[in-house]
């Protein structure tokens, strides 16, 4: 069953500007065949050199918000592809006033294009959709294709 679009979704996303890093990919440009390169400068985004932890599939943001609250010396970036869901996470982060937490909208398959090599200290995959059907296994965040992406952006010895 599809999730119903939240009321005033675009306005709510716009109001989350200070925690919203935007889309990983401009999907319309990608369909037109335009190449995109937007490497994230974490030092510029957060204004410090603290280690970066990445949560892939953050959902409504409960884990990311709590982790950022407990670890103010770590920069957190949470990624979610569902706009209906990530808006709740961003609103919660704004309410908690956490300067060390930002959000990206998009699919995990594009992470490698936007995170520099060896830039993330730890990656979290909490309760991501298991895609139980055999034909959907390539969509699982633990599929070998995704593991290679994570390996590329993780620092040596990263978790």
Predicted stretch roles:
Residues 57-61:
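Class I SAM-dependent methyltransferase "Motif I" SAM/SAH-binding loop
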Residues 56, 79:
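Conserved beta-strand/loop positions that form the S-adenosyl-L-methionine
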Residues 82:
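Conserved SAM/SAH-binding beta-strand->alpha-helix loop
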Residues 74-77:
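Short beta-strand element of Class I
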Residues 142-156:
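A short glycine-rich, Lys/Arg-flanked "PGG" loop and its adjoining helix->strand segment in the class I
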Residues 1-52, 62-69, 90-117:
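S-adenosyl-L-methionine
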Residues 86-88:
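Short alpha-helix immediately C-terminal to the canonical SAM-binding loop
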């Amino acid at each position: 069953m599809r999730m119903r679009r939240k009321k005033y979704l675009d306005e709510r996303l716009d109001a989350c500007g200070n925690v919203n890093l935007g889309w990983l990919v401009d999907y319309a440009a990608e369909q037109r065949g335009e190449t995109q390169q937007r490497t994230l400068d974490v030092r510029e985004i957060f204004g410090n050199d603290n280690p970066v932890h990445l949560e892939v599939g953050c959902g409504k943001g409960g884990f990311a918000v709590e982790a950022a609250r407990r670890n103010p010396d770590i920069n957190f970036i949470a990624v979610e592809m569902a706009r209906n869901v990530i808006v709740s996470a961003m609103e919660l982060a704004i309410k908690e006033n956490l300067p060390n937490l930002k959000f990206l909208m998009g699919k995990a398959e594009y992470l490698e294009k936007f995170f520099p090599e060896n830039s993330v200290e730890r990656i979290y995959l909490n309760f991501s959709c298991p895609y139980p059907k055999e034909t959907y296994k390539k969509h699982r965040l633990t599929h070998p294709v995704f593991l290679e992406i994570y390996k590329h952006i993780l620092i040596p010895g990263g978790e």
